[in-house]
């Protein structure tokens, strides 16, 4: 009997997983690996419940397809399970939905054992695979595929959907219509290791599912929304991700739940009122005075909502939702020992977890001797793909009345850029470096 998503079953996951392959659908087997001891993934998120590296073998009347592999340390588990369902000379197709190392760790050895196999992946994944295989790349039948292309296994066909930036540029999905299985790689995944493998058997993994989405997919939510539109017409009965439980019970509910996770963020982006957030750290109140002046100038625009935040002694994480929903941010920092202050760098580091591409960015601050902080912050904002329409504003020591007026004018110009009243302009690296 099927159950809704996240129905609470025994709280503790089972870490003693299957020793062999596991049937997912007729002719489809899980041949992945369990990693219950993992506690930190890609540096950016904690994994209290470990993770799984899900790989799949699909048997057709004319050969076998292998869809994704596992992290290199678990290649032995992968090959043992694969050998239980297929001979290497039967492997006709290797599909790489994503080239991150936790999905391609066994690829070089798999190709050595099955050199006759076709390798199919997205065109954007080709340079990554070339880097992985080095000189061996030319030895194999490797081609990029896009939406609408497919490879036949006889009575089963693997069809491909290009799904870029979910969450790397190379990501794609693979559709097995005969068994209604959609292989989504990282999409719909979760770092949750339970040897029972299926969502209707494992413990309650709601937190892991939502936390994974927040830390991995959230910066790419607009791309995820497009992919949901692309795959929604498919009559899938199973979603087979590359991490976490296989979603065989009510799989479409996970698509709906993912839409809910992103709907509020996308709705915030469509509002007519623009938002500007100003964050600052100040040693002797000089940068604080400049921040207030910028705030006052920007707030003169009736179409811009401006908020001012002193970061001293506060936590960065609570601001991330606000920043993601905002249209622009301005960061203020004094220059201390030739650099921006640590709190500002911590905020800049945290911004990699959210979508910042295309947002307005600006920097300002006071200094005593060298004044590099503003330039360094601007460079990082550009690295985050934000647009900088105005050169950063710096004042030496405490701002004068004239410099405070310059700050208000700076704020007015930022507001004009947000509302489209100013001519589009973007500061480039050469202009930053020259200051």
From Swiss-Prot:
Q: What is its EC number?
A: 1.-.-.-
Positions with a binding annotation for Fe cation 2 = 102, 186, 243
Its EC top class is oxidoreductase
The coenzyme or cofactor needed here is:
FMN; Fe cation
Q: What is the effect of changing residue 285 to A?
A: In strain: ATCC 33303 / B10
Per UniProt, Fe cation 1 binds at: 98, 100, 167, 186
> Residues of the signal sequence?
none
Kindly indicate whether the keyword rRNA-binding belongs to this entry: no
Q: Which SUPFAM superfamilies match?
A: Flavoproteins, Metallo-hydrolase/oxidoreductase
Q: Does the keyword Metal-binding apply?
A: yes
Q: Which domain of life is it from?
A: Bacteria
Q: Which InterPro entries match?
A: Flavodoxin/NO_synth (IPR008254), Flavoprotein-like_sf (IPR029039), Metallo-B-lactamas (IPR001279), ODP_dom (IPR045761), RibonucZ/Hydroxyglut_hydro (IPR036866), Rubredoxin-O_OxRdtase (IPR016440)
Give the record's keywords alphabetically: Electron transport, Flavoprotein, FMN, Iron, Metal-binding, Oxidoreductase, Transport
Give the cofactor note: Binds 1 FMN per monomer.
* Region of interest called Zinc metallo-hydrolase, as start-end residue ranges on this chain: 48-228
Q: Which residues form the Flavodoxin-like domain?
A: 276-415
**Outcome after substituting residue 265 to R:** In strain: ATCC 33303 / B10
Q: Name one GO molecular function term.
A: electron transfer activity
Query: Main role?
Result: Low-potential electron donor to a number of redox enzymes.
Self-association state and partner proteins as the record states: Homodimer.
Q: Which family does it belong to?
A: In the N-terminal section; belongs to the zinc metallo-hydrolase group 3 family.
Please name the PANTHER family in this protein's record.
ANAEROBIC NITRIC OXIDE REDUCTASE FLAVORUBREDOXIN
Its recorded name reads Type A flavoprotein fprA
Q: Which organism is it from?
A: Rhodobacter capsulatus
From the broadest rank down, the organism's phylogenetic lineage runs:
Bacteria, Pseudomonadati, Pseudomonadota, Alphaproteobacteria, Rhodobacterales
């Amino acid at each position: 009997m099927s159950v809704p998503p996240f129905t609470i079953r025994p709280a503790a996951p089972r870490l003693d997983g299957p020793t062999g392959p596991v049937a997912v659908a007729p002719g489809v087997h899980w041949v992945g690996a369990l990693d219950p001891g993992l506690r930190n993934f890609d540096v950016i998120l904690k994994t209290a419940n470990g993770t799984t590296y899900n790989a799949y073998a699909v048997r057709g009347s004319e050969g076998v397809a292998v869809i994704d592999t596992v992290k290199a340390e678990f290649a032995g588990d992968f090959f043992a399970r694969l050998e239980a369902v297929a001979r290497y000379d039967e492997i006709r197709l290797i599909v790489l939905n994503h080239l991150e190392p936790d999905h391609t760790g066994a690829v070089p050895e798999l190709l050595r054992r099955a050199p006759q196999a076709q390798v199919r992946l997205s065109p954007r994944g080709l340079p990554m695979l070339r880097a992985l295989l080095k000189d061996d790349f030319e030895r194999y039948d490797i081609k990029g595929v896009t939406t609408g292309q497919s490879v036949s296994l006889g009575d089963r066909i693997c069809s491909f959907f290009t799904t870029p930036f979910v969450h790397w540029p190379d990501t794609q999905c693979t559709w097995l219509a005969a068994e209604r299985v959609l292989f989504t790689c990282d999409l719909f995944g979760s770092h949750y290791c339970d040897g029972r493998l299926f969502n209707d058997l494992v413990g309650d993994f709601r937190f892991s599912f939502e936390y994974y989405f927040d830390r991995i997919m959230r910066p790419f939510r607009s791309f995820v929304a497009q992919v949901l539109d692309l795959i929604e017409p498919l009559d899938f009965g199973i979603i087979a991700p590359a991490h976490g439980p296989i979603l065989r019970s009510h799989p479409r509910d996970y698509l709906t739940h993912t839409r809910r996770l992103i709907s509020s963020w996308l709705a915030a982006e469509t509002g007519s009122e623009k938002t500007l957030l100003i964050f600052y750290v100040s040693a002797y109140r000089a940068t604080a005075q400049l921040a207030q002046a910028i705030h006052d100038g920007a707030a003169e625009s009736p179409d811009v909502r401006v908020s001012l935040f002193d970061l001293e002694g506060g936590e960065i994480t609570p601001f991330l939702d606000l920043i993601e929903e905002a249209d622009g941010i301005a960061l203020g920092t004094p220059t201390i020992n030739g650099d921006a202050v640590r709190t500002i760098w911590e905020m800049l580091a945290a911004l990699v977890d959210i979508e910042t591409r295309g947002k307005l960015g600006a920097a300002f601050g006071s200094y005593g001797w060298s004044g590099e902080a503003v330039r360094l912050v601007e460079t990082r904002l550009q690295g985050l793909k934000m647009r900088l329409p105005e050169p950063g504003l710096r004042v030496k020591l405490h701002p004068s009345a004239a410099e405070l007026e310059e700050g208000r004018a700076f704020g007015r110009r930022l507001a004009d850029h947000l509302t489209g009243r100013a001519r589009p302009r973007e500061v480039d690296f050469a202009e930053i470096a020259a200051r």
